[in-house]
Amino acid sequence: MKQELARIEQFLDALWLEKNLAENTLNAYRRDLSMMVEWLHHRGLTLATAQSDDLQALLAERLEGGYKATSSARLLSAVRRLFQYLYREKFREDDPSAHLASPKLPQRLPKDLSEAQVERLLQAPLIDQPLELRDKAMLEVLYATGLRVSELVGLTMSDISLRQGVVRVIGKGNKERLVPLGEEAVYWLETYLEHGRPWLLNGVSIDVLFPSQRAQQMTRQTFWHRIKHYAVLAGIDSEKLSPHVLRHAFATHLLNHGADLRVVQMLLGHSDLSTTQIYTHVATERLRQLHQQHHPRA
């Protein structure tokens, strides 16, 4: 089994070099594929001998055992990529994953905040404190640009141009995009850079735009805790929250105000338009609710 796990590490190294996948994705693949190797081992199977029926049985067992459909989809993606790699590297003469059936994924609408709720969230930080001034700037940038949290905390000083009012983002797959900041976000960035960031750095020289209290790069988890803190202050139900709550609000509110779907796709950094289209369902649902509330024949 050690050889099997070593082969998985070789595959993950190759995947990182070819696709530049995020560390979180690689770690998830490692967990899924290690579980698969153990599952095969208990049945007297290996990566060299497993057949399509065996892999389909694994996926079915995961689903029946309460595995979420999204987790099963990720497992399937990892399995397919692994066996494609093994076939390409001549370790196998076939690809048993080629005809595996995909689990049906329920279409989950993004958690959505109204414009009034977003406004309350943005007003929650106390701007006379350097730490909360940083958070205020981060929230404003997040809502103005629709960045992923990982993209936001990874920003450097060289990524922003306040004169041009844009931010350069390196997104998934190492793809670069330029996103407008808007006047409000530029104002709060200027204020933070003058009155907040120097206090946080306390003489330390780093290029990170939004450093932590220890003058290091902030983690996604830390910022998520900050968002929850301000949501409580703003009186927002925790069930409406997710780490990407302002990214979702950014997309939905743009569409509500008539933005073109492809423009929103470009701003979000989605490679596939279908990923962006889910936000149209949120916007349509909001219109349906308003119609029911206000139309005399609804």
Swiss-Prot record:
Cross-referenced PROSITE patterns: CB, TYR_RECOMBINASE
Protein origin, superkingdom: Bacteria
One Gene Ontology biological process: cell division
Localization annotation: Cytoplasm
Domain Core-binding (CB) per the UniProt entry, residue ranges: 2-87
GO (cellular component) term, any one: cytoplasm
Ranges of residues in domain Tyr recombinase: 108-292
Chief place of localization: cytoplasm
Annotated Gene3D superfamilies: 1.10.150.130, Intergrase catalytic core
Active-site residues (renumbered): R148, K172, H244, R247, H270, Y279
PANTHER family in the record: PHAGE INTEGRASE-RELATED, TYROSINE RECOMBINASE XERD
Assembly with partners or alone: Forms a cyclic heterotetrameric complex composed of two molecules of XerC and two molecules of XerD, in which XerC interacts with XerD via its C-terminal region, XerD interacts with XerC via its C-terminal region and so on.
The protein's name: Tyrosine recombinase XerD
Organism field: Shigella flexneri
Lineage, top ranks: Bacteria, Pseudomonadati, Pseudomonadota, Gammaproteobacteria, Enterobacterales
